[in-house]
């Protein structure tokens, strides 16, 4: 396994303070946190434990204290609901015309769509049927469906909260849109968010994996992190694992790199579509290419909202569905997306579907409905992103800033620190490594602490090149910042101010690779991973869209691994953890307490 070249210092590289112990897979815990799910398990496990990455605290009813609920799905844009409906209908008609022009066989026959009005005629007459509990659930288990006396709820218990029950709890999802969910409301500070994560992970380790927290001092941890990361957050994760949870040692790995290990490939463009974000990165020899990384703010949850909007237009029989107020309904839409949606143009006409739902009184109901092009139009929003405007038009693309543009007051080898000390002591410039750091251009300081390591490309802000450039009174400083955004972080262009479609984002990411040979290799190995790539036909559709936009003769291959796509990164991290070459990546609890951030600079498997 190759790794990034760590930044050297005049004092040389750190030496491990302890003898490396033999690797023991049952003692290695692999953790892959996401916006909606947490995947955690031993490195020797066939599959990880997958649970909801959320926690619910029992409220103390006090005057003026209102319950706080993080939404499970992205919220609808409520600025102008009437205008939103009109615009959505316009885009639905455009997408419908695109589908009607699809050829479905060798005889050049076109698709035949079923109008929503015809489907609504059937669906409005559909009546829910009472059925016994599925899976022969016992009456005793039904009575224990929800433990209302528990002070803290996790996983399935949260998903069983009705709108009425949820009023007694504050519910937090500590990660949203791929990063820590830090906000200004109740329980939204950085330390509170880390406490939520500690609670969830402790529950998973103790209650589900049956590992006593006191025994973690004999266990190791591998944490899968995003390709586009905030260095301050990674530092907090290390402290959480080694000092608060008490693991003996740990190391971090980027999710796209872990995915290549899980898929068994040495290079490729990894497209990770999660519940609330889509990230793209080009991997070569185990290294994530800096300029190719991007995180887009849409995912499977946005597709759920599009699907619900489309189903309502054709008379969705479950009229009380409210994904914003009920986690039960939000989970239902997630299941309907997995069961109904596809990207197979040959499937057309009305299809009769059924789904089951448990009501608050314990009664199970079965709904029957007809679905037409709604099943293909919802995932088509990945490529016709105007449909995603219902969850907000103000979208941002995040790319990773180079190390010299990131600041950390606790890192004594930070580029900014070296500049400041170099001014006071000119003799330090004699060191060639320090001199190289001092010679790098200096960008403007960040606007906020939470986004200090992220370059934000916002299509709503006017800019000649698609990069949001902060207003400044100094033209030279503004030009320097623009230069950094253009050359180091990449520019993700948007058509008519619209969020970038999936195929265009992949083309842009691969286009930023250094050589034509690397680009050719990336086009030939596009790996789809993540919980939202299970839609049948998605890989073939993306491959067709990309093939039409590259030079003739370029081989394009989009594929998924023959396993649960959401587990590929976890499995890859488990494989990495037991490799002989990964021994030098481990950071022990003692070393972290003694050296801190310097260890990440020296040993992280990616450029710090």
From Swiss-Prot:
Localisation per UniProt entry: Nucleus
GO CC annotation terms, alphabetical: nucleus
Gene Ontology biological process terms in this record: chromatin remodeling; DNA recombination; DNA repair; regulation of DNA-templated transcription
Predominant cellular place of this UniProt entry's protein: nucleus
GO molecular function terms listed in the Swiss-Prot or TrEMBL record: ATP binding
Gene3D superfamilies for this protein: 3.30.420.40, Actin, Chain A, domain 4 (3.90.640.10)
The entry's keywords: ATP-binding, DNA damage, DNA recombination, DNA repair, Nucleotide-binding, Nucleus, Transcription, Transcription regulation
Chain segments annotated as coiled-coil in the UniProt record: none
InterPro entries from the UniProt entry: Actin, ATPase_NBD
Pfam families linked to this entry: Actin (PF00022)
Amino-acid positions noted as binding ATP in the UniProt annotation, renumbered to this chain: 272-275
Region (Disordered): 1-20
Domain of life: Eukaryota
Function: Plays an important role in the functional organization of mitotic chromosomes. Exhibits low basal ATPase activity, and unable to polymerize. Proposed core component of the chromatin remodeling INO80 complex which is involved in transcriptional regulation, DNA replication and probably DNA repair. Strongly prefer nucleosomes and H3-H4 tetramers over H2A-H2B dimers, suggesting it may act as a nucleosome recognition module within the complex.
Assembly with partners or alone: Component of the chromatin remodeling Ino80 complex. Exists as monomers and dimers, but the dimer is most probably the biologically relevant form required for stable interactions with histones that exploits the twofold symmetry of the nucleosome core.
Family in the record: Belongs to the actin family. ARP8 subfamily.
Protein name, UniProt field: Actin-related protein 8
Organism: Drosophila pseudoobscura pseudoobscura (Fruit fly)
Lineage: Eukaryota, Metazoa, Ecdysozoa, Arthropoda, Hexapoda
């Amino acid at each position: 396994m190759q790794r990034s070249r760590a930044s050297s210092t005049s004092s040389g590289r750190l030496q491990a303070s302890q003898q490396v112990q033999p690797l023991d897979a049952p003692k290695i815990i692999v953790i892959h946190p996401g916006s909606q799910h947490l995947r955690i398990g031993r490195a020797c496990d066939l599959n990880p434990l997958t649970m909801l990455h959320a926690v619910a605290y029992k409220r103390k009813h006090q005057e003026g204290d209102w319950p706080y609920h993080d939404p499970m799905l992205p919220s609808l844009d409520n600025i102008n609901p009437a205008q939103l409906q009109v615009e959505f209908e316009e885009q639905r008609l455009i997408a419908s015309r695109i589908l009607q022009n699809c050829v479905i066989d060798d005889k050049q026959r076109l698709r035949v769509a079923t109008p929503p009005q015809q489907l609504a005629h059937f669906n409005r007459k559909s009546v829910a049927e009472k059925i016994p509990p599925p899976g022969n659930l016992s009456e005793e288990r039904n009575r224990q469906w929800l433990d209302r006396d528990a002070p803290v709820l996790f996983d399935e218990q949260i998903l069983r909260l009705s709108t009425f029950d949820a009023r007694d709890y504050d519910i937090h999802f500590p990660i949203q849109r791929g990063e820590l969910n830090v906000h200004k409301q109740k329980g939204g500070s950085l330390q509170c968010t880390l406490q939520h994560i500690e609670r969830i992970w402790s529950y998973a380790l103790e209650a589900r994996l049956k590992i006593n927290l006191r025994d973690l001092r004999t266990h190791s941890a591998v944490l899968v992190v995003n390709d586009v990361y905030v260095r301050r957050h990674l530092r907090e994760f290390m402290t959480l694992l080694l000092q608060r949870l008490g693991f003996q040692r740990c190391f971090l790995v980027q999710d796209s790199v872990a995915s290549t290990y899980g898929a068994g490939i040495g290079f490729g463009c990894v497209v990770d579509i999660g519940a609330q974000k889509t990230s793209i990165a080009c991997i070569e020899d185990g290294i994530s290419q800096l300029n190719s990384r991007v995180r887009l703010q849409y995912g499977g949850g946005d597709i759920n909202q599009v699907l619900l909007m489309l189903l309502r237009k054709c008379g969705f029989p479950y009229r009380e569905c409210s994904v914003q107020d009920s986690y039960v309904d939000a989970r239902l839409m997630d299941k309907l997306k997995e069961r109904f949606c596809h990207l197979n143009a040959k499937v057309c006409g009305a299809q009769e579907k059924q789904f089951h739902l448990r009501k608050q009184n314990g009664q199970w109901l079965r709904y029957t409905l007809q679905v037409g092009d709604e099943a293909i139009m919802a995932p088509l929003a990945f490529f016709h992103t105007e449909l995603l405007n219902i969850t907000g038009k103000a979208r941002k693309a995040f790319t990773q800033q180079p190390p010299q543009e990131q600041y950390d007051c606790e890192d004594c080898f930070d580029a900014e620190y070296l500049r400041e000390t170099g001014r006071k002591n000119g003799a330090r410039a004699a060191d060639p490594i320090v001199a190289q750091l001092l010679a790098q251009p200096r960008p403007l300081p960040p606007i906020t602490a939470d986004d200090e390591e992220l370059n934000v490309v916002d299509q709503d802000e006017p800019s000649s090149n698609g990069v949001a450039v902060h207003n400044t009174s100094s033209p030279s400083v503004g030009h320097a910042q623009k230069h950094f955004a253009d050359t180091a972080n990449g520019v993700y262009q948007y058509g008519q101010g619209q969020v970038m479609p999936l195929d265009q984002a992949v083309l842009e990411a691969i286009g930023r690779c250094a050589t034509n040979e690397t680009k050719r290799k990336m086009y030939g190995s596009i790996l789809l991973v993540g919980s939202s790539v299970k839609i049948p036909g998605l890989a073939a559709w993306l491959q067709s869209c990309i093939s039409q936009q590259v030079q003739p003769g370029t081989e394009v291959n989009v594929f998924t691994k023959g396993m649960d796509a959401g587990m590929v990164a976890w499995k890859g991290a488990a494989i990495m953890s037991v490799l002989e070459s990964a021994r030098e990546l481990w950071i022990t609890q003692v070393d972290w307490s003694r050296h801190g951030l310097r260890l990440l600079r020296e040993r992280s498997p990616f450029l710090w």
